[in-house]
Every structure is written in C-alpha cells, then in structure tokens.
Amino acid sequence: MPKPEIVFVTGNANKLREVSMILGGDASPFTLVNEPLDLEELQGADLQEIALAKLQQAVHALGPGRPVFVEDTALSFDEFNGLPGAYIKWFIKSMGLAKVVKMLDSFENKGAYAITTIAYADSKGQLHVFQGKTHGTIVDSRGHTNFGWDSIFQPDESQNNETYAEMAKEDKNKISQRGRAFAQLKEYLYNTGI
C-alpha cells in the first residue's frame, strides 16, 4: 500500500532537502511531495499571518483535501526590535550578506534570533501552526553562502562557535529554528496522521 502524500510548497531546493531529512526521509510514514508554486508573500511583521496567507494560496491552488504545508523564516536583530524579521531575504537580495552584517557595526550587541513558522492544512482542511526559535549572534560570513543567511548566524547552542553554514546538517537540524518547528510538525503528523 502506498504511503499517503503530504505537499511542501517551496521553490528552495536547500529547504526541501533539509525538511525531508528532519521529517524522516524515506523512513517516514508519508511521502513528501514538492510543489514549487509561486505564492505571493504577504508583507508584514506577523509571522503567523504571513504563513497562513501563503497556506491559503497553496490550498486554493492545489485544491481541498490535500495535506499541505508552507514555511516562512525570519531573522531578527535584537538592536533593531525585530527587524529585518520576515524581510531578511529582501535585505540579503538587495544588500548582500556583508552589508547586512555591517548594519550592526555601530552596536555592541550583535544578538539575533531566528524563527520558522509552519502553516499546515490537514486533509480535512483544518489549519495548524508550528513555530521554532533559536537565539544567536550575527557574525562575519563563515562557511558556504548558498543557503540564505546561514553563514552569518552563529547559534548560541553551537558546540564549536560555528555558523549554521559551518555545522554538519544533522547538528544544525537539532538546534535550528527550522529543525525545532519541523520536529513539532513531525510529532503531530506521526501522532495524528495527515
């Protein structure tokens, strides 16, 4: 009997690989299917509102009854009262990583926190939200630069003062905001089904 499918709407191949690993890969009781839909991203500071708006678009595009989830991740600087937050990818796209780091040059506190918000619609159309959070420090870029801001975020729980980009994937997934949020989704799915 084939495993039930759950749809992850993302166009980010790195994110897809990471989430597949966190949810159990081939050993999971469901099949993770990717739909790279082009969703309009609501602009704002409320992460749950942003994720739920993306989810509603995904449900509309895929049709009712298909279990589907979306995620949105924010990186917030302590000194900037939550900014750039959900706008981080636009900051990086327009300024580059080095200038994003430079924004904190005049501040002693380089503290930051990352939040991943997952919005999930089950097969009955019920909506669920899961969030994970990790605190850390903004540092000069270290490690690969092919996955967003991973090379400038050093989580407080890093054993060797490594950025996400320098960490082994398995280690990163244990402490990252995305790993924490998807661990909640995984527990929910494994306990209640899709």
Curated annotation (Swiss-Prot):
A GO BP annotation: nucleotide metabolic process
Annotated positions binding Mg(2+): E41
InterPro entries: ITPase, ITPase-like_fam, RdgB/HAM1
Domain of life: Eukaryota
Keyword Metal-binding: yes
Signal sequence, start to end: none
E.C. designation(s): 3.6.1.66
Cited Pfam families: Ham1p_like
Keyword Protease: no
Keywords, ordered alphabetically: Cytoplasm, Hydrolase, Magnesium, Manganese, Metal-binding, Nucleotide metabolism, Nucleotide-binding, Nucleus
Reaction equation(s) it catalyzes: ITP + H2O = IMP + diphosphate + H(+); dITP + H2O = dIMP + diphosphate + H(+); XTP + H2O = XMP + diphosphate + H(+)
Gene Ontology MF terms: dITP diphosphatase activity; ITP diphosphatase activity; metal ion binding; nucleotide binding; XTP diphosphatase activity
Cofactor comment: Binds 1 divalent metal cation per subunit; can use either Mg(2+) or Mn(2+).
Record's GO cellular component terms: cytoplasm; nucleus
Protein residues bound to ITP: 10-15, 54, 72-73, 89, 147-150, 172, 177-178
Localization, UniProt: Cytoplasm; Nucleus
SUPFAM superfamilies named in the record: ITPase-like
Cofactor: Mg(2+); Mn(2+)
Subunit-level organization: Homodimer.
Entry's family note: Belongs to the HAM1 NTPase family.
Protein task: Pyrophosphatase that hydrolyzes non-canonical purine nucleotides such as inosine triphosphate (ITP), deoxyinosine triphosphate (dITP) or xanthosine 5'-triphosphate (XTP) to their respective monophosphate derivatives. The enzyme does not distinguish between the deoxy- and ribose forms. Probably excludes non-canonical purines from RNA and DNA precursor pools, thus preventing their incorporation into RNA and DNA and avoiding chromosomal lesions.
Name the UniProt record assigns to this protein: Inosine triphosphate pyrophosphatase
Organism: Kluyveromyces lactis (strain ATCC 8585 / CBS 2359 / DSM 70799 / NBRC 1267 / NRRL Y-1140 / WM37)
